[in-house]
């Protein structure tokens, strides 16, 4: 039955929940509104329809639904809930014709937070989707001297040229090196072929 999938997903959610509790971390989805409380956002940039790396979708925009999911987006509510029924119906839809309605999400520091479509993300992650289509708004923080912020601003420059969001660096200069590696001049835009070749190689 379709609830079998839900029960499997629930077990995965419960495992993640227990692991987080054991590490002293929150056992629920991250909430972007909470993260932004002390952040100065200087711009909102609509990115349009984006292929979002599933592993970069880490939370939800508002706190409304965040306790329904573990941090890995697996469900935590019991199988006899309306939530479980809706989740199972999405499974049906995914297996029959695929889930095509893009989610709505916010990007902050190259991580993504869902405004609409938490259950879709949950089902797609359960089926190990690599990318999830979403209409994305980027929230740009004020510049500061932290390493994370400086790397992010390098990413913003790179994204303008490459439109690639699945490469992460932990040191400064990585994106400029990557631009050279793809045989592009500083400031030169990538073509669709560049993107295809790179994703195949990556």
Residue ranges and their predicted role:
Residues 1-109, 115, 126, 171-182:
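Short, charged/polar connector segments at secondary-structure boundaries
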Residues 133, 137-139, 143-202:
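Solvent-exposed functional surfaces
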Residues 97-112, 118-151:
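A short, basic-hydrophobic beta/loop patch
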């Amino acid at each position: 039955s379709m609830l079998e999938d839900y029960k499997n997903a629930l077990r995965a959610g419960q495992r993640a929940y227990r692991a987080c509790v054991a590490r002293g971390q929150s056992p629920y989805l991250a909430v972007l509104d909470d993260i932004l409380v002390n952040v100065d956002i200087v711009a909102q940039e609509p990115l349009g329809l984006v292929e979002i790396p599933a592993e970069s979708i880490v939370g939800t925009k508002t706190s409304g639904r965040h306790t329904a999911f573990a941090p890995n987006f697996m469900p935590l509510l019991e199988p006899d809930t309306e939530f479980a029924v809706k989740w199972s119906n999405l499974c049906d839809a995914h297996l029959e014709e695929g889930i095509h309605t893009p989610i709505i999400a916010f990007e902050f520091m190259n991580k993504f937070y869902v405004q609409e479509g938490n259950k879709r993300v949950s089902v797609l992650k359960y089926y190990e989707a690599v990318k999830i289509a979403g209409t994305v708004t980027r929230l740009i923080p004020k510049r500061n001297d932290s390493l994370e912020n400086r790397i992010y601003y390098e990413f913003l420059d790179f994204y303008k040229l490459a439109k690639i969001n699945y490469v992460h660096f932990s040191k400064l200069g990585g994106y400029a090196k990557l631009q050279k590696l793809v045989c592009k001049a500083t400031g030169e835009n990538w073509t669709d072929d560049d993107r295809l070749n790179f994703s195949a190689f990556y």
